[in-house]
Amino acid sequence: MRLIKLPKGKHQCLIYATAMLLDVEPSEIIEILGHDGMDIWWPELAVPNCFRGVHIQEILDVCAHFGYGLICYQVMPRTSPFGRVDMVRNIFEVDKALERIDRYLKEPGLIVTDVHACAWDGESVYDPNGMITSIQSVALKEFYLLKRI
């Protein structure tokens, strides 16, 4: 996997992570999307929250364009009765959840945290901020496993 660094001032981690995962240029992703995610949709909010961004559903379409699908695995899935946020429960015990996600991390995909996205080659995290790091350095929330469709 090739590290592609975000230009300063750009808030396009999902575009760049996807480009690394698919081994294409970010400009190809932007062309397929029809936008770069940098339109200001919420001018009352500070940077980067003011930007349109890119939704993961758009990235699913981009991957399909290249003949791939993404399968989402949440690290710690939770459930509750409808509308009862006071009754949320984890589906798995922590040990089982970590063992489960480790099985899927043997293959390439997208690493998603609450506020950032990176590419994963099955061994290392390729961070669009310009670093190659270990999975332990990331607050992983969801893993999107890349599969040929």
Regions found by a protein language model. Name each.
Residues 1-50, 57, 61, 65-71:
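Active-site nucleophile-adjacent alpha helix/oxyanion-hole segment immediately C-terminal to the catalytic cysteine
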Residues 5-10, 96, 106, 141, ...:
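Context-gated lysine
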